[in-house]
Swiss-Prot record:
SUPFAM superfamilies: P-loop containing nucleoside triphosphate hydrolases. The modification N-acetylserine is found at residue 2. The gene is Rab28. This is Ras-related protein Rab-28. It is a lipid-anchor. Interacts (prenylated form) with PDE6D; the interaction promotes RAB28 delivery to the photoreceptor outer segments. Interacts with KCNJ13; the interaction may facilitate cone outer segments phagocytosis. Also participates in nuclear factor kappa-B p65/RELA nuclear transport in endothelial cells. Keywords: Acetylation, Cell membrane, Cell projection, Cytoplasm, Cytoskeleton, GTP-binding, Hydrolase, Lipoprotein, Magnesium, Membrane, Metal-binding, Methylation, Nucleotide-binding, Nucleus, Phosphoprotein, Prenylation. Its main location: membrane. Disruption phenotype: Knockout mice are viable and fertile. Cone cells have elongated outer segments (OS) and enlarged OS tips. Knockout mice exhibit reduced cone and rod electroretinography responses and progressive retina degeneration. Cone phagosomes are almost absent, whereas rod phagosomes display normal levels. PROSITE patterns: RAB.
């Protein structure tokens, strides 16, 4: 085995994405895992699962298991089981929808309850999505930052539509969980806008209206 192979390490992290159904959670997870953006809104029922492997400084390979939890699961019997064992929690809201921000209190209360019963204390990140719609913002940045300071969250603003800061968000969360500091060059390289491709799930318009796509499970090949 070569020195480079010996130095290479592999880790796996469970990242759970929570928030209201229209906050853009699935678009965020899809943008990170596949660098695509689905124009059609599809409600996540229960749970969707995404995978992506990234490399952090120190030749550390990390596979992120991204659990996209359906917005309607709040108060459901399975939510605590989905959250249990997570190393990272992303609380996602739509910056143009104040209610989606207010409802994060309910999501976070579940996280706190589960954390009290778990040996794993997750890193919690507050993610303001849809910054491409800054002109329609209803949640002021100082509200976002105050919520972070009061609860010890890390702070992120992203656009799942343009890809702005999406990879950087997941990269910084993974690095913070593992105690790794990113330098300025690494942050600037990750803070890029990816081209948002429209995902066409069905080539036949008539069939699409009658039989909408039922599966949204995906992983990076």
């Amino acid at each position: 085995m070569s020195d480079s192979e010996e130095e290479s390490q592999d880790r796996q992290l469970k990242i759970v994405v929570l928030g209201d159904g229209t906050s853009g959670k699935t678009s965020l997870a899809t943008c990170f895992a596949q660098e695509t953006f689905g124009k059609q809104y599809k409600q996540t029922i229960g749970l969707d699962f995404f995978l992506r492997r990234i490399t952090l400084p120190g030749n550390l390979n990390v596979t992120l298991q991204v659990w996209d939890i359906g917005g309607q699961t709040i108060g459901g019997k399975m939510l605590d089981k989905y959250i249990y064992g997570a190393q990272g929690i992303l609380l996602v809201y739509d910056i143009t929808n104040y209610q989606s921000f207010e409802n994060l209190e309910d999501w976070y209360s579940v996280v706190k309850t589960v954390s009290e019963e778990s040996e794993t204390q997750p890193l919690v990140a507050l993610v303001g999505n849809k910054i491409d719609l800054e002109h329609m913002r209803t949640v002021k940045a100082d509200k976002h930052l105050r919520f972070c300071q009061e609860n010890g969250f890390s702070s992120h603003f992203v656009s799942a539509k343009t890809g702005d800061s999406v990879f950087l968000c997941f990269q910084k969360v993974a690095a913070e969980i593992l105690g790794i500091k990113l330098n300025k060059a690494e942050i600037e390289q990750s803070q890029r806008v990816v081209k948002a491709d429209i995902v066409n799930y069905n080539q036949e318009p008539l069939s699409r209206t009658v039989n909408p796509p039922r599966s949204s499970m995906c992983a990076v090949q």
